[in-house]
Amino acid sequence: MNALAATNRNFRHASRILGLDSKIERSLMIPFREIKVECTIPKDDGTLVSYIGFRVQHDNARGPMKGGIRYHPEVDPDEVNALAQLMTWKTAVADIPYGGAKGGIGCSPRDLSLSELERLTRVFTQKIHDLIGIHTDVPAPDMGTNAQTMAWILDEYSKFHGHSPAVVTGKPIDLGGSLGREAATGRGVVFATEALLAEYGKSIQGLTFVIQGFGNVGTWAAKLIHEKGGKVVAVSDITGAIRNPEGIDINALIKHKDATGSLNDFNGGDAMNSDELLIHECDVLIPCALGGVLNKENAGDVKAKFIVEAANHPTDPDADEILSKKGVIILPDIYANAGGVTVSYFEWVQNIQGFMWEEEKVNLELQKYMTRAFHNIKTMCHTHSCNLRMGAFTLGVNRVARATQLRGWEA
C-alpha cells in the first residue's frame, strides 16, 4: 500500500469514528489545488534539461497552506498528495493556524552543481510564485532542500511581490530565519517522546534507543537523548549502521560523520547490517528516514516497546496491525515530527511581527505546544477508545472539519 492509500485509509477510519457526513468527508479528501510544472534549465555545460515540479495545496480551512519542498528522484504526484494531506492533519494536531501543502521536484540534488540547483529553484519559483504567498501557501525545506534553497525562493518571489520574508520558513538566520529552527524537528521528537514515556511512568534517562537515519532529525534527536541520559545503542544512515550495547558517544559520532561523511569506521561501535537495525533490541525505536520501512516482513521481529515516528509514514498499515497486536506503542508521525512545522509557524509569526525571539523562548514554546498536543491526543483516545494514531487523526480531522463547517464549505 503506497503512502496516499495509507493516508486515505487512516483519514476514512478517523472520519467513521467521528461520524462525519459523507459530503464533508469527500470535501476534506480532495486537494484544493494540484500544480504540475515543467522546469527547464541550462546545465553548467550548456545543455538544456527539463524537470517536473509539483505542488499540492490540500486544505486552507484553518489558515495558509504549509509544507515542505523536496528534491528527490522518486518524487511523484501520489507521494506529494499524501504528504500534503498529512500536513493538513499535522498542523491541526499541533493547533497552529495552517492548512497543508507539499511540493517537490523529481531530481537528484547530488548530481546537480550548486549553480544548477539555484537555477532550478528559481525557475520553479517563477512557475508557482502567483500560487504561493504569506497568507496563501508557505513552503519550507524538506528532503534534499535546505535554508539556502529557501533563500533562493525568497529572493525570486520578492522580485515579483516585494520583500516578503514570511513567504518561506526554514530560512538562514540572516534572512529572517528563526533561532532553534535547525534543531526543531529533532527537538520536537524528543519532547514528544518525553510526553509519551511520562504517560507510562518512564523517562528518557536509562532507556535504550535505536535511531534509523542520522540526517538533521536523527542527529538532533540522538544528541538530545544522549544529553538527557538516554542510551543510544544503534544508529544507521545511508552509509551504514553501527551498534554499541554500552551506548554510542553521539558527540563523537557526529564529529566522525562531519569529518568523513560516513558512519563507517567509527571506533566507538561495531558495524552491523542496516537491515537488522529496526529489529535491534531496545526500549524505543525512532525511524527518522524514509517511509514504509516497517512492514509485514519485519514488524513481527521488532523488539522495541515504543516506536516514535520521526519520519513520515514509516509504518505501513500491515505493520501497524502486527505491532499493535504485539502491544507495541506507536507515536504517530502527524504528531511526533510536528516540531519542525511548529517552529516554522514561530518563524512566520516573527517575520510578520518584524521581531526576533530568543532561542530559549522558541524552545520553551515548542515544548508547550508538543506537550499540549499529546494531552489532546490522549483525550481523543479516551473519548473514542482508540490508539494514539487514531487519537491524532481524529483530533486533526475534527478540527479541520469544524473549520470547514464554520466557513460553510461542506455543501
Curated annotation (Swiss-Prot):
EC? Answer: 1.4.1.3
Q: Is Mitochondrion one of the keywords UniProt gives this record? A: yes
The subcellular localization recorded is:
Mitochondrion
The reaction(s) this protein catalyses = L-glutamate + NAD(+) + H2O = 2-oxoglutarate + NH4(+) + NADH + H(+); L-glutamate + NADP(+) + H2O = 2-oxoglutarate + NH4(+) + NADPH + H(+)
GO-annotated molecular function? ATP binding; cobalt ion binding; copper ion binding; glutamate dehydrogenase (NAD+) activity; glutamate dehydrogenase (NADP+) activity; glutamate dehydrogenase [NAD(P)+] activity; zinc ion binding
Task: Provide the alphabetized UniProt keywords.
Answer: Mitochondrion, NAD, Oxidoreductase
Which first-to-last residue range defines the signal peptide?
none
Query: GO cellular-component terms in the record?
Result: mitochondrion; plant-type vacuole; plasma membrane
User: Catalytic residues?
Assistant: K102
InterPro entries in alphabetical order: Aminoacid_DH-like_N_sf, Glu/Leu/Phe/Val/Trp_DH, Glu/Leu/Phe/Val/Trp_DH_C, Glu/Leu/Phe/Val/Trp_DH_dimer, Glu/Leu/Phe/Val_DH_AS, Glu_DH, NAD(P)-bd_dom_sf, NAD_bind_Glu_DH
GO biological process annotations for this chain's record? amino acid metabolic process
Q: Which SMART domains match?
A: ELFV_dehydrog
Q: Which domain of life is it from?
A: Eukaryota
Keyword Zinc present in the record's keywords: the answer is no
Main subcellular location of this protein, as a coarse class: mitochondrion
Family statement: Belongs to the Glu/Leu/Phe/Val dehydrogenases family.
Please give the name of this protein: Glutamate dehydrogenase 2
Q: Upper taxonomic classification of the species?
A: Eukaryota, Viridiplantae, Streptophyta, Embryophyta, Tracheophyta
